Amino acid sequence: MKKKLSLVLCFIFAIGLLSGCAISPEPITPDTASGLWDKIFVLPLASFITLLYNLLNHNLGFAIILATAIIRGALMPLYSKSNKSMAIMQEIQPKMQRIQKKYENKKDQASQIKMQQEMMALYKEYNYNPMTSCLTPLLQMPVFLAFYQAISRHPLIQDAAAAEFFGINLGSTGTVPNYILAFVVAGLTVYSQRLMNKNMKANMNGQNNQTSDMMMKVMTYYFPFAMFSITIGTPFAFGLYFLTGSIMTIIQSFIFKRPAAKK
C-alpha cells in the first residue's frame, strides 16, 4: 500500500510540475520528433488525433475527445484488474498486519525469511499480486504526459481555423472558456474521487487504515485543485482531455462498483 501511495504522490507531483510548464513551441511531426519518447508515444498519439480529425469532418475538438475515450476504454480492463487487486489488498490488510506484528521484534534473518514466506502464502491464498494494484498509477503517468505533449504540440493547435471548437480556440489559455471548463473539470474530479473513495471504503469492510485514509485525502483535496489549475494554464484542448477522462472515470466507477463491493 505504501508503494502505491508513493506512485500516486509521484503522479501528483508530475501534475503539479506540469501546471507550471511552458508549452513547447515546436510542433510534433515526423521531422521534429526526437528520441524514443517522441517517436513511440507523442508522434503516434498526435497522428491518431489527426486521423480522427480527418474522419470527423475536420473537427479537432471531437477528435481529441474521441481519442481520449478510445484510449481510456482500451486501458479499462487493466484499470479494472488494478482496482480488483486493490480490493483484495484491502481485504487481506488485517492479516498482513498480524503477520508483520508477529515478527515486529524479530529482526534476525531466519525470522524475516519466515515472515516473507507467510506473506507469500497469504498472497497465494487470495491470488494477489502486489504489483497489479500499482498498474493504474503506472499507466496514468505516461498516458497523461503523452497526451499533454501530443495536444500542445499538435500542428493543428496553432492553426486558428482548424483549432476552432464551437467558437472557442482550442489553443487558448487563461481565457473565460478555460475558466468555465476548469470549474466543470474540477467538479467532475471531486465527484469521481468521492465515488472511488466510497468504493474503497466499502472494500475495507469498515476497517480503518492510516495509509488508505492518507491516500484518499490526498486524492480528494489535491486532484481537483490540480485539474483546475492545469485546465486554466494549458490549451483549452487539453481541458477536453481532462473532461473526457473525468467522465470515463465516473463511468468506470459505476461499472466496477458491484464486483468490488462483493469482496
Predicted regions span which residues?
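Helix-loop-helix
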Residues: K2-F13, L17-K263
